[in-house]
Amino acid sequence: MVLKAEHTRSPSATLPSNVPSCRSLSSSEDGPSGPSSLADGGLAHNLQDSVRHRILYLSEQLRVEKASRDGNTVSYLKLVSKADRHQVPHIQQAFEKVNQRASATIAQIEHRLHQCHQQLQELEEGCRPEGLLLMAESDPANCEPPSEKALLSEPPEPGGEDGPVNLPHASRPFILESRFQSLQQGTCLETEDVAQQQNLLLQKVKAELEEAKRFHISLQESYHSLKERSLTDLQLLLESLQEEKCRQALMEEQVNGRLQGQLNEIYNLKHNLACSEERMAYLSYERAKEIWEITETFKSRISKLEMLQQVTQLEAAEHLQSRPPQMLFKFLSPRLSLATVLLVFVSTLCACPSSLISSRLCTCTMLMLIGLGVLAWQRWRAIPATDWQEWVPSRCRLYSKDSGPPADGP
């Protein structure tokens, strides 16, 4: 271990083998071993402080790296959401490189932090940590042959219980002082090693920070270019949207105007149709009323005519029954007048001179008249009695209608 290697370089390494170790001193006498135990306690306290300091430094560095990784992730998401699809693969490739580097750094820091926690736990438990031995072995100034380590780590030979008592008091301060000097040298070397590692880590962090800054600058440039392009595209989109809104508003006005005109026409047509329906209903009602009135009038007239016909038939029957001689006289009067005319004609012919009789014209005339008289007599005799019976009442009816008072109007 580191402390054992420091013992080989200290003056106590040249002591003879019969000098007892500090373990035998501390076990034999409590008084003289006090300064040695105090030196060991101070060294352990210094080691714990250095390990705690390193743990704090690594924790802070781990927090910074994680914050940087989260910031890179947020920037990557923003760029991907705003970038063109042709630029997305390049941005993704650059982000993967940075993310891999950051993940490796974080894993390395976490491994170191875990080792420091283990060292601190071992120091708190009272045993020497193995990590300090590894740090000492990594330093070429701390290398030593294994025989010397075995020589120092071996316990003292059993020389009996009187050995510690026979040790002179002058040699004890020398052993303790050499031990304390070796511990101080080991602490200084460990501190220098830690400082060198911190410097190397700081340089590495600075290099990564410079690379991250350069990448951040490139991302900012790409972000500004994408922002300008998006602003121009947004301006064009806003202009096209404004034009589309104006066009849509104009079309809406035209459509509303035409729709209003169509609605007005439909309203007018409905109104005219309603008026026409009302007019047709009124006219049909009036026509039906007139037809009904005319029908009622005709019905009343027909009923009156039927009643009048019945009355006239009854009156004609009563007249025929009450005055048959008068009807017979009226029927025979034309015959008598005809016979009178014939007699007058015959007497006139007889009174004419014979010269007229001898003439052919007169002869033909006489013959024609005689033939007509014979035909009329034969025709009169051929008419049956039933026809005369039917003809006489009808003539009487017509006569009674013509001679009677006029009927009432409708």
From Swiss-Prot:
Residues 10-23 have a biased composition (Polar residues). Residues 24-38 have a biased composition (Low complexity). Belongs to the TEX28 family. Residues 1-43, 137-164 are annotated as: Disordered. InterPro entries: Testis-specific_TEX28, TEX28/TMCC. Residues 93-128, 185-245 form a coiled coil. Testis specific. It is a single-pass membrane protein. Pfam families: Tmemb_cc2. The keyword Transmembrane applies. It is found in: Membrane. This is Testis-specific protein TEX28. One of its GO terms (cellular component) is membrane. PANTHER family: CEREBRAL PROTEIN-11-RELATED, TESTIS-SPECIFIC PROTEIN TEX28. It comes from Homo sapiens. Keywords: Coiled coil, Membrane, Transmembrane, Transmembrane helix.
